[in-house]
Amino acid sequence: IIYKSQKGFNLYTNFSEKVILTKKNIVNFLNKRNLKKKKLKKTDLYIGFFGYEILNNLIGVKVPKQKSNNFPKGIFYKPDTLIKLSENLKYRSEYQLKKNKKFDININKATYTKIFNNFKKKIKKGETYQIKICTKYKNQSKIDPLDYFCRLSKTNLAPEAFMIKDKNFSVISCSPENLIIKKGSSISTKPIAGTLRKKKNIDKSKALKFFRKNVKETKEHNMIVDMERSDLSK
């Protein structure tokens, strides 16, 4: 597992425990505490991810049954070794990579438009005030996950990113926002909302000016901040 932060890259390896989350064990996993050790090491932690389905089950939210793809609903690893890596991560792949530029999407434009218009009516009726329509893209290519992660880290300037390389799958993610940060008794969040296409003639000051004057972008950002504030209060 490689984790990228503003301070560089952390490589976690030699895992003593691997927990595949299910409906039956997630509560016990979240309540697990190490009360014996007074001084915790930097490897006294779990690294992994939660799937939306398993979190929805945890809080009693019902969602339509999803197609099974045999991918874990959530998985966490406990490392025994931490290696600090250089900020300029370099890697040369030994594999012959085969890239396919064609992507398949699970819904077409007509179906997406129908879903969008339906949700638009629900928002106008006051049933909800935010809906995120998700689509799934598939691509059949032969890539090296670490090589892909290194390339992504150079082109995407997100402050945080990570890569999990397991035996049968790899997960790569990067995000400009941090949902939950907990340090001691302090909990904070760093939400981001708004979209502006990158152009050579747009610098940071011009981008800020655009977001401050744009009504749609300002309202979207305020809505996200309000939602995060509500979540933290719970």
Please tell me what each predicted stretch does.
Residues 1-234:
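Extended alpha-helical targeting/anchoring segments
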